[in-house]
A protein has these predicted regions:
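Structured, helix-rich domain cores that form ligand/interaction pockets
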Residues: 1-266, 274-315
């Protein structure tokens, strides 16, 4: 397995990973706030947002490190804030709301609830690095109906990116996705399975209000929505005993009481790749035109505001 250690504000590899529960997507809308007020609510006024084209009917968007704030749609659309998994890591690492990552989330959820805003999507994920789940077994059990769920919809997909199982339709307010994260990332020989609960609307708001550590909250919602079970003579399938692996997963998730923010997935290698591959030709031309000494002076005197994403690397 692989783990991520905070070092220079980035992610670094270690030999043994901890299983963690983390927020992995947040999307919410407001009809009463400006984009600037949303940025303030995120505690991210100090970072360099760029203005770009919006999506899904919004004309404009403010963007920084996988966080998008869309605006200028129809009058009834308001402002839409969307944070992908990496956007969630950005928020945890750079937000000035609090010093502790979990307290940052609490403060943001309090803001959302206090104004009655709508959470259009909230993903909470459990990462299994220790070998609790065999993704092939989970897939076979799903196809054989060895589970109970609030939803009748299921699908299993096997591809070059690994195996994924989804219980719950894309339209439902709650769905569970189980997939081989290592295969998705192209990390051969690594055990990394993810169990993800995706919630919408009132279900997402309800999750944000659970007064428990994130591991217990995740385990409780998962047990209520989906269980893998062993066949039994009881006519009520919900009373069938749980599969050992599902019991172990729930038990493991429950004990995760401290929210461990993995940190921004921005490291030296990505920085180097960007400079060499994206800007390399322009840099080479500048050095040839102005000379190395003058080029270095131009970089030192640049008027662009510092980007915390890069500052994290050199702390």
């Amino acid at each position: 397995g692989t783990t991520y250690k905070r070092g220079m504000g980035a992610l670094f590899m270690d030999s043994k990973a901890d299983n963690i529960v983390l927020y992995d997507w947040l999307s919410f809308t407001s009809k009463i706030h400006t984009p600037e007020q949303i940025i303030d609510a995120l505690g991210l006024f100090h970072v360099p947002w760029t203005n770009t084209k919006g999506a899904k009917g919004y004309q404009d968007r403010k963007y920084f490190s996988c966080i998008s704030i869309h605006y200028n749609g129809r009058p009834d659309m308001g402002v839409w804030c969307e944070m992908s998994g990496q956007g969630c890591r950005t928020f945890e690492t750079l937000s000035t709301l609090e010093t502790d990552a979990m307290k940052k989330w609490r403060k943001l959820f309090d803001f959302i609830r206090s104004f009655g805003l709508k959470i259009t999507r909230l993903d909470v994920a459990y990462d299994d690095h220790s070998g609790i789940l065999d993704i092939g077994e989970v897939s076979r059990d799903a196809q054989c109906g060895m589970y109970v769920s609030k939803s009748d919809y299921w699908e299993c997909i096997v591809s070059s990116k690994g195996t994924s199982i989804q219980i719950g339709s894309p339209q439902s307010k709650v769905l569970v996705r189980i997939y081989d994260k290592a295969a998705e990332r192209g990390k051969q020989g690594e055990h990394w399975n993810r169990v993800e609960i995706q919630m919408r609307d009132d279900r997402a708001i309800q999750f944000s209000m659970i007064p428990l550590p994130i591991g217990e909250a995740f385990a409780g919602v998962l047990l209520n929505y989906l269980r893998y079970v062993e066949p039994d003579t009881d006519s009520n399938k919900w009373r069938w005993p749980m599969k050992d692996y599902w019991y172990n997963l729930v038990e493991d998730a429950e004990r995760i009481s401290i929210y461990t923010a993995p940190g921004m997935e921005y490291n030296e290698e990505r920085c180097k790749r960007y400079v060499v591959n994206q800007a390399g030709n322009a840099i080479d031309a500048c050095i040839q035109m102005y000379g190395l000494y003058e080029f270095e002076r131009m970089i030192q005197d640049r008027e662009v505001a510092p980007n915390p994403k890069y500052e994290q690397l050199i702390k």
